[in-house]
From Swiss-Prot:
SMART domains: RPOLA_N. It is found in: Cytoplasm. The keyword Cytoplasm applies. GO terms for molecular function: DNA binding; DNA-directed RNA polymerase activity; magnesium ion binding; zinc ion binding. DNA-dependent RNA polymerase (RNAP) catalyzes the transcription of DNA into RNA using the four ribonucleoside triphosphates as substrates. Forms the clamp head domain. This is DNA-directed RNA polymerase subunit Rpo1N. It comes from Thermoplasma acidophilum (strain ATCC 25905 / DSM 1728 / JCM 9062 / NBRC 15155 / AMRC-C165). Zn(2+) 1 binds at residues 60, 63, 70, 73. It comes from the Archaea.
Length: 885
């Protein structure tokens, strides 16, 4: 039979009868031992050769196959006494409740049976909806369970009580119903009555849920391992089966020898415990079976269920070959489409190339190089690791056999060559929460031990460089490589399907640098310009202006060199949002309204609104008008220009950024004192009972709302005072105003005051009895006692302020952790619910049986990445373009 493949037409789930278990079995296991003194499997033991082989050199006694040929075969154990299958306890109770203890019939009258039989016979038990079947059968079972007298034989019935996990008894007695008695009761149920329980008697008789024969899984399901000491260590399942066989033998001997009933019952309970924990070692109500070391055994249910179980861990998702994982590092001079791969990884990862008449000479040259070739300068050169013959045999290439195998290869062979520059690979960072968590990059072989990529690609991956690791997958098929280049390449993912705007763009230093380069259009000498432009292509040169006989270059002209010809765009910069001036193009003293005409920057300041992810107007326009390739080229040039410029110019921030004069500190302290007076007056008014409640609120809520409002006002006002002394010459302010990092609120907390700390939108009120900390009087509801921090980070927080600040900060951490787990679970449920949906050729959304879900994908059939941020058209885009000038 080996080697014969058959197509599976259908799968039917059923219970195994004792006879089927015996027929399926190749050996009756009667001894608990595994190997003899010579290390050879014992006959009729748990490692009997009839159940398969795991040792090289041995052959299976059933099919004659070796280790890699034998699929494994079942054995069986004849149990001394019946035991309840823990997985069917609910069903057993259902049968005991709804059937007569004497005659075994379902406790429905003949009239009810005649009425309900046509209804249940209409149901298709094999292909019907399980929920509909369950609702119908539950109706019959509930009706039958309520009867305390059998309508067929007149026998008085008792209510059945289940003492979990597997003990049954009749109500009012402590005498348990033994598994043997349960089995006898279930055997009396006629086949014709089983339809009312949703059971098919041909595939599932109820007495089969009480075990008399236990199947023993094949050896390759529970292989033993050899430890470093040379001792064998058996699998957890084998340990449990040993316990079951030993207790079953003791129970059989005690029963046959006429031992007292108490001893027999104890051994029977012990056998039930071992069989229960063999199936599920986390059954509530009984202690888990443990290894000698104290570790809980991993039995059948634990191997199947959960994230680490067989289905989710080994079938839905697997570990794969041709992949690599290491720490990531930034490399500002790589293209967004590129990934820097360490030489060590490039030598290990291979791409299969099928030899044909067009590439055979090239492949021979590659093979002749061997495994570790280098050029005359000692740089990496692609080698070959393996060649594969047409019959599937792999030949490892070494420096000794390289020339011989180069001559031997022919058309139809496969050459597994190492990575070379330009190969397309998939790059991924987990958690993979959206499409852009896995994108196609082209390879650049670099020295070092880390993967490197352009910082502009951090946003879609949500990556930073504090120790993050990423995965790289080398594509093995030509069709997949073509797909990756055309669909998955980074430049094709610039626009996010979530909001229809760019998700790849300049971050942090890029934004700061371009802000400094363009704000107020600074002037540079020829030498300075050469330094700034050094990292760009040599043919990109800005337009020079002659002033007093000298060549000068302006920041906007330098930035214009990286813009494509024909680009026309107008927008307000991020600087505008924090400006006190009007941001209109006709009246713009703050230099905040950007205008680009025919690829030349006329006016404005480049900042977050121009080149950053989520808001980059220039990237958005270039992608829509010139395509993905031009957008990627702009981002490459923009990041090189920004890093080159800021490296040359220099940019430093420090604690001195937040120095404000003593007069400003005094003004802030005065503001805080005034606010405290107002809060104290509010509290006095409240205590006198004169505070008027706000509509829909209690007096207490009104007081809290008023105090929070006062605390918010003083923080905002102190922030304004601090900010008025911190202008656009201050590096930290440049970062905040340009959108590179942080906000002016963060800066005001450092230089002004930190302000009111809150938990769940209100002031702090928990802690000790009637006070937040023992440092305050009981009943104190003043500002300081309820989490108002009057210090700034510059001056430093007092111990109580630091404690309150930590409480406020911890809420953010806990909230983040809770939201992460909830959103992760929600996403998993959505994925499972939608996994059978597909978009067909007519853009209709259907499930696997062809049911229509949506007439048009997304109701409108529009790709969000091609929409104008979710709208059909962008009027500004249409109006302000070539026709403008």
């Amino acid at each position: 039979m080996m080697g014969i493949s058959k197509r599976i037409s259908s799968i039917k789930f059923a219970l195994l009868s004792p006879d089927e278990i015996r027929k399926l079995s190749q050996v009756k296991v009667i001894t608990a031992d595994t190997y003899d003194d010579d290390g050879y499997p014992i006959e009729h033991g748990l490692m009997d050769l009839h159940m398969g082989v795991i040792e090289p050199g041995l052959r299976c006694a059933t099919c004659g196959g070796k280790v890699d040929e034998c699929p494994g075969h079942f054995g069986h154990i004849e149990l001394a006494m019946p035991v309840v299958h823990v997985g069917f306890v609910k069903e057993i109770k259902m049968f005991l409740d709804a059937t007569c203890r004497s005659c075994g019939r379902i406790k429905l009258t003949d009239d009810e049976i005649r009425t309900y039989l046509p209804e249940i016979q209409k149901m298709d038990f094999e292909t019907g909806d399980p929920e509909d079947i369950e609702i119908l059968t539950k109706k019959y079972v509930d009706l039958a369970s309520q009867r305390m007298v059998c309508p067929h034989c007149g026998a008085q019935q008792s209510k059945i009580i289940l003492d979990k996990p597997t003990t049954f008894r009749e109500e009012g007695t402590n005498v348990k119903i033994t598994p043997k008695e349960i089995r006898e009761r279930l055997e009396r149920i006629p086949d014709d009555d089983l339809i009312f329980f949703g059971f098919n008697p041909k595939t599932a008789r109820p007495e089969w849920m009480v075990l008399t024969v236990l199947p023993v899984p094949p050896i390759n399901v529970r292989p033993s391992i050899t430890l470093e000491t040379g001792e064998r260590s058996e699998d957890d399942l084998t340990h449990k089966l040993v316990d079951i066989i030993r207790i079953s033998q003791r129970l059989r001997e005690s029963r046959d020898n006429g031992s007292p009933q108490l001893i027999i019952e104890d051994l029977w309970d012990l056998l039930q415990f071992h069989v229960t924990t063999y199936f599920d070692n986390q059954t509530p109500g009984i202690p888990p079976a443990r290894h000698r070391s104290g570790r809980a055994l991993k039995t059948l249910v634990q191997r199947l269920k959960g994230k680490e179980g067989r289905f989710r861990s080994n079938l839905s998702g697997k570990r794969v070959s041709f992949s690599s994982r290491t720490v990531i590092s930034p490399e500002p001079y790589l293209s967004v489409n590129e990934v820097g791969v360490p030489e060590r990884a490039a030598r290990e990862l291979t791409v299969p190339v099928i030899v044909n008449q067009f590439n055979i000479d090239e492949m021979r040259e590659l093979i002749k190089r061997g495994r570790n070739p280098r050029d005359q300068f000692g740089r990496y050169v692609t080698g070959v690791n393996y060649v594969i013959r047409p019959d599937g045999r792999r030949i490892k290439i070494t420096d000794q056999n390289a020339a011989e195998n180069a001559d031997r290869i022919d058309i139809g062979w496969t050459v597994e060559r190492q990575l070379m520059e330009g190969d397309i690979v998939l790059f991924n960072r987990q958690p993979s929460l959206h499409r852009m968590s896995m994108m196609g990059h082209t390879v650049r072989i670099l020295p070092g031990q880390t993967f490197r990529f352009n910082l502009a690609v951090c946003t879609p991956y949500n990556a930073d460089f504090d120790g993050d690791e990423m995965n790289l997958h080398v594509i093995q098929k030509e069709e997949a490589r073509a797909e990756a280049r055309i669909i998955m390449k980074v430049q094709e993912q610039i626009m996010s399907p979530r909001f229809g705007g760019p998700i790849i763009g300049g971050i942090h230093d890029h934004v700061t640098a371009l802000f400094l380069l363009t704000h107020n259009n600074p002037r540079y000498t020829h030498e300075e310009m050469v330094h700034i432009m050094a990292y760009l292509e040599p043919d990109l040169l800005p337009e020079a202006r002659i002033e007093n006989g000298e060549k000068y270059y302006y920041g906007r002209d330098i930035f214009s060199t990286i813009l494509p010809k024909g680009l026309n765009v107008r927008f307000r910069s991020k600087l505008c949002s924090g400006s006190s001036e009007r941001c209109e193009f006709e009246d713009d003293p703050s230099d905040t309204y950007v205008e680009i005409v025919d690829g030349k920057m006329i006016h404005g300041t480049i900042d977050e609104a121009a080149v950053s992810p989520f808001s980059g107007a220039i990237i958005d326009k270039i992608f829509r008008k010139f395509g993905s390739q031009e957008a990627a080229r702009f981002i490459d040039r923009m990041t090189r220009l920004a890093v080159g410029f800021i490296t040359y110019r220099g940019f430093s921030t420090g604690i001195s950024d937040y120095d404000i004069p003593e007069s400003a500190v005094a003004r802030i302290e005065e503001l805080v004192a005034q606010a405290e007076d107002r809060i104290n007056k509010l509290i006095e008014t409240f205590r006198r009972g004169e505070l008027q409640p706000a509509p829909g609120r209690s007096v207490e809520d009104t007081l809290e709302m008023e105090i929070l409002s006062e605390a918010g006002v003083v923080r905002d006002e102190s922030g304004k005072i601090a900010s008025s002394y911190l202008g656009l010459k201050v590096p930290s302010v440049i970062m905040a105003r340009s959108g590179a990092r942080a906000t002016m609120l963060n800066i005001s907390e450092v230089a002004g005051i930190v302000g009111q700390q809150s938990v769940r939108g209100g002031r702090l009120n928990r802690g000790y009895y009637n006070r937040t900390l023992p440092h305050f009087k009981r009943g104190d509801i003043g500002a300081d006692a309820r989490g108002f921090v009057r210090s700034s980070y510059m001056t430093g927080l007092s111990p109580t302020e630091y404690f309150f600040h930590s409480i406020g900060g911890r809420e953010g951490l806990v909230d983040t952790a809770v939201r992460t787990s909830r959103s992760g679970y929600m996403q998993r449920r959505l994925i499972n619910a939608f996994e059978d949906l597909k978009v067909d050729d007519s853009r209709e959304v259907k499930d696997t049986v062809g049911s229509l879900i949506q007439i048009r994908y997304g109701e409108d059939g529009i790709d969000p990445t091609r929409s104008a941020r979710g709208k059909a058209v962008d009027m500004n885009y249409i109006l302000f373009d070539e026709e403008r000038r």
